[in-house]
Amino acid sequence: MGMKIKMDVAKFKEQLRATADELGRATRPAAQEGAQIIYLQARLNCPESDAAHMFHGTNAVYGPYSPGNLRNSIYQVFSKDNSFKDVSTYHISWNADKAPYGAMVEFGTSRAAAQSFIARSIKETRSEVRAAIKARFIEEVNGK
C-alpha cells in the first residue's frame, strides 16, 4: 500500500521571494550607516595646513588651496555600478577636481611620507562599522 502526498509550493516560494526582497532592500541603508562612520572619521583624520598652500606635483604646482580644502573635498556616494540586489557599495574618497593633490597625501610620494586619512579611517573604525551595519540591517528587516 502506498501513500501519495501532493504539495503546492507556490505560496511558499512567493513568501521566500518576498523575504529575499526585504533583505535586499535592507542592504543599502545598512551600508550607508557604515559608510557614514568611515566618512566622518576620514574628515577627522585628514591633515590640514595652518595657512593657504601650494602643492608641488611632478609636473605642476597646484594652488593656492585654503586650509581644510582636502578635508572639505571628502565625499561618500552610493555606487550603482558596484551594487546589486543584495549588495550595496558606497565609495568614500576625495574630489580630485577640488583637491588634485589628495592621492599624494593619502599614498605619499618619493619625497613625502603618506598621511593616510581614508585607509586609516577604515582600519580605525572596522569593528564600529561592522556593528553599525549589523544593527541597521536588523532594524530595517524588523521594520524599525
Predicted regions and their residues:
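Amphipathic alpha-helical, heptad-repeat/coiled-coil segments used for oligomerization
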Residues: 1-23, 136, 140, 144
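Short, low-complexity, charged/polar segments at coil/turn and helix-coil boundaries
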Residues: 14-111, 131, 144
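Conserved pre-catalytic core of RNA-dependent polymerases
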Residues: 113-118
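C-terminal or internal capping secondary-structure element at the end of a domain, subdomain, or sheet
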Residues: 121-144
